[in-house]
Amino acid sequence: YEEEGFEVEFTNGGGADNTMAAVLSGSADVGFCGPEAALYIAIGGSSDSPKVFGQLTKRDGSFLVARTPEPDFKWSDLGGKEILAGRKGGVPAMTFEYVIEELGVNASLNYDVDFNYMTAAFESGIADYCTMFEPTASDYEAEGKGYIVASVGEQSGEIPYTCFAAKESYINENPEKIEGLLRAVTKATKFVME
């Protein structure tokens, strides 16, 4: 990022809704999250809505975590079970919905718990399964709090999962920064892949 002239401060927004709130308020120039939040804001009629200008990932990175080891897990095992799936309308929850609908699984998806509190809710006894990202999923398994039984992304296939978005005015006023950020991300991705 320094090669492109950036002094970057990364902050965990705690979900696409909070990330877009930071972009809209001006406390963040660029948000990195699922593309759905930018769409919801545009549909809402914002005069300076965020626009997606780059995509980083193309697959859901979450894992399905069970309370007990299930070495022979099948998606059909979720029938009649409760799953903490994320915020309703968020890409993680929509991807999970897609997976179980495609497989014809009738499960109860719990959308009542904020993304930042899903793992704590699961640990406290809410739901039979929970979707978790790394490193949390592996940490839970290492601590005996839960067991990874499936990869949501492996089952869902490719989707535009995470992207970069900024207010339209910021993009129009800072095209060199937008292009520089994308170059920096491309360089970083190539570095990681080598």
Feature names for model-found ranges:
Residues D114-E194:
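Pocket-lining segment of extracytoplasmic ligand-binding domains
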Residues E2-V105, L109-D112, A121, D128-P135, ...:
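Short, glycine-/small- and polar/acidic-enriched structural segments
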